[in-house]
Design a protein with these regions (language model features):
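Bacterial Sec-dependent N-terminal signal peptides
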Residues: 1-18
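Short, conserved micro-motifs composed of acidic
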Residues: 16-305
Length: 305
């Protein structure tokens, strides 16, 4: 009898998990045409500098912007409670004097990773440039952030993405250098291996990695050959049967234009792809807006790979 109860309880938990519905700020879901996301809430007159990242339970969304003058980067947060979204605010882990950007949830939603040039631990001798930090979700709040393993956080680390096994994909780029690369570090019981540069990197600029939770595909931005109009475009590669990445493929004109397309993130339910684009910028209003599109485009690209 107890075994039957356990099976029923497990089934109920799985059903509840599957029924988690995310309210994407009340926006009408997109089809296979990219649409502006949450005008006036996420896509505003500010300079958006990351895609929005939603927690798996749909209760929190974070993103980053650049404040003018000075291009000061800050992370913003909104929370869903009692059937409505809060106004945007600085999360409790923020250091408002630092440049902080590129928030990214772990697939289980228990941790948030971000890039910051805040001062590290006492007697920290490597405090130059942005490095990767991690905050733990504690109820509706956040823990005090901790600096990631020094094998990774040496200075010059920016966007990152985490697989369900804890493997870390991130960007390393020296200040003002045109050569930015995507690196991968394996997680072994909470300890990270020395980062390795992925073979998919070109001689130019690669940034903004998003890896699928099961590491089946990787989306990133690049100015490599094959970009539309010589701009920064989004590219995708798929994991082959031998465990190697396929040749990076331009994600096509449903996403990329002659403008810059950056900051790719897939929603935790796997339904939507978010990205930033400056296709709508004007002389009076420069910068990026956030767009979203049905994530079925990923499977379309896989079939044509």
């Amino acid at each position: 009898m107890s075994l039957i109860f356990i099976v029923i309880l497990f089934s109920c938990n799985q059903t509840n998990k599957q029924r988690t519905i995310i309210d994407y700020l009340g926006q009408k879901p997109p089809t296979d045409t990219a649409e502006l996301f949450a005008k006036g809430m996420i896509s505003t007159s500010s300079l958006e500098h990351s895609a929005p990242v939603f927690s798996p339970d749909g209760k929190t969304v974070l993103w980053s912007i650049m404040k003018m003058p000075g291009y000061h980067m800050v992370i913003l947060e909104m929370n869903y409670d009692n059937g409505k979204w809060s106004s945007s605010h600085s999360p409790s882990f923020s250091d408002t004097l630092a440049n902080e950007v590129y928030p990214s949830f772990s697939p289980d939603g228990k941790h948030l990773y971000f890039s910051s040039d805040r001062i590290g631990a006492k007697n920290d001798t490597n405090a130059k440039g942005n490095r990767l930090w991690k905050a733990e979700r504690t109820g509706k709040d956040w823990s005090i952030p901790v600096l990631l393993d020094t094998l990774i956080s040496k200075g010059g680390e920016y966007a990152c993405s985490i697989s369900e096994t804890g493997n870390l994909y991130f960007t390393f780029g020296a200040h003002r250098s045109p050569d930015w690369n995507i690196l991968r570090s394996e997680n072994d019981n909470g300890q990270y291996s020395s980062p390795l540069k992925l073979a998919l990197n070109s001689t130019g600029y690669e940034d903004g990695p998003f890896v699928a939770p099961d590491e089946r595909y990787l989306i990133f931005e690049s100015d490599r050959q094959g970009s539309i109009g010589g701009s920064i475009d989004l590219f995708i590669c798929f994991k082959n049967k031998d465990g190697q990445w396929s040749e990076p493929k331009n994600m096509g004109d449903k996403i990329n234009r002659s403008s810059h397309e950056r900051f790719a993130r897939v929603s935790p339910d796997g339904k939507y792809l978010f990205f930033g684009s400056n296709r709508n910028q004007t002389e009076k209003q420069p910068g990026f807006d956030i767009f979203w599109i049905n994530a079925s485009i990923i499977e379309e690209l896989r079939k044509n790979n």
